Amino acid sequence: MPARRIVIGIGVSLISICATGANAFALETQKAREIMDAILMQNGISATEMSAENSNGTVIFTYDDVRLDLSGYSSARELVLDDVRVTMNDTDIANQVDIGVTLPERGKMLAEATSDQRELTMRKALGSLRWDHVNGVPVNFTGSADFLIGDEPVTRKHWLMNGLVIRWMPEEARISWQAAEWTGPNREKRGSVKSTSFLLYPGENDETHLDYAHDGLWLPSLLQPRTVRIKSSSTGLPWSEARPILQKGFNDMMTGLAPRAARRQIANDLWQKAADNGAPVKIDEIYVEGRGLEALGKGEFIAQKAARYGFSGQLDVDLIGRERLQDLIGTPQSPTLLGALVPFAVDGLAAGEPGTQGTTNYDVELLRDGRIVVNGITVFSGTSGS
C-alpha cells in the first residue's frame, strides 16, 4: 500500500495523547481516516501513513516522519518521530471516538543551533484521548511516560524525568512527575526534585482549587525550599470559567507550545479572569521546609489591574528557624554580604514577633502600590530596590 501524506494533530507532548478505548460500534477504516485527517489538519503535524489495519472495528494506523513545529521557544524547533502507532475506536456516545497513540523510544528535536537540538528517549510514552469529531475538541485525555530524557549532543546537557502524568478531565487538570534532574555542560548537576504535582479541580460551590506540591528539591544555592505545599481556592474564579482557559492551555501545550509558555498563558488568562471578577484568591495553606527552616501560613490575595505587581493581599506566616536564617542574611545593624543584596529580606526577618511554641510570627501585607509591610513596618517601598 503506497504511503499517504497527511497532517496529524497531536502536539509536542505526543506523549499525552495515546492508547485504548471502548469499542461500542465497528468503525470503518475510511471513516477513521477522515476523522484523523480533520483532527490532524487542525493541529498541523505532517506525517507519512505507513499502514492502516482494521481489527473488529479497531482501526490501527502507523506513521513515520511525524513532524511538528514547536512554538514558544527562543528559536524555531521541530519535533520528529518515526513509528508512531495510533488506534481509534468508536464509543457509545454519538460523535465521540477514543484515540490512542504509542510513541517510539527514540525521537529528535531539530533546530538550527546545535545547542537547541535534543536527542529524545521516551520509555512507555502513551495515553488516551476522547475526541468530539463534530465540534473538533477533546473531551478528555490522559498521558503518561515511565521515563523521558533529552540530551543536547555537543555539551551533553540533559534533563530527565520519571513517572510523567498529564491529565485533562471535565473535573480535573493534573501534571505530575517524579525523580526529575537537569544538568549543565558535561552533566554538571544543576538541580533535581523527587516529585512535583500541579492539580486544579472544582469545589462544592463551583470554586476553583489549585494545589501545588514538590518534595526533595535540590538546587546549587544557599536557600533550599526542599518541600513546598500550597493549597488555594477562589470563589471569584468559578470552575465553569476557569475550565475553558485550562482546556485551551493544555491543548496548546499538546500541540506544540512550549510548556513554560503554556503555563504563562494559563496563568495570565486566569489572572485576567480573577481581576475582572474582583473576588479574592484564598491561600488555604502554604508550607515551606528546607535546611532547618519551616514556615506555615495562610492568607488572601486579590488580582487587581491597578496593583503594581498584579495583586494585593495579606499572608500570616509562622516561622521556625529564624536564627538560622539570620545567620545567613544578618540583621539590619549587621547584614551579611548576602543580606546586603536583599535589605528588604533582612528588615522583614527582623520585624518578626514572638509566636506560639517557639515560632516567629509575620503578618505580611502586599499593598496596591507595591509596598511590603511586615508587622506594621514597611520593609520594601515598591520603588527601585528598597
Segments (PLM) and residue ranges:
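Glycine-rich, small/hydroxylated-residue low-complexity segments
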Residues: 24-386
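Small side chains
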Residues: 9-11, 21, 313
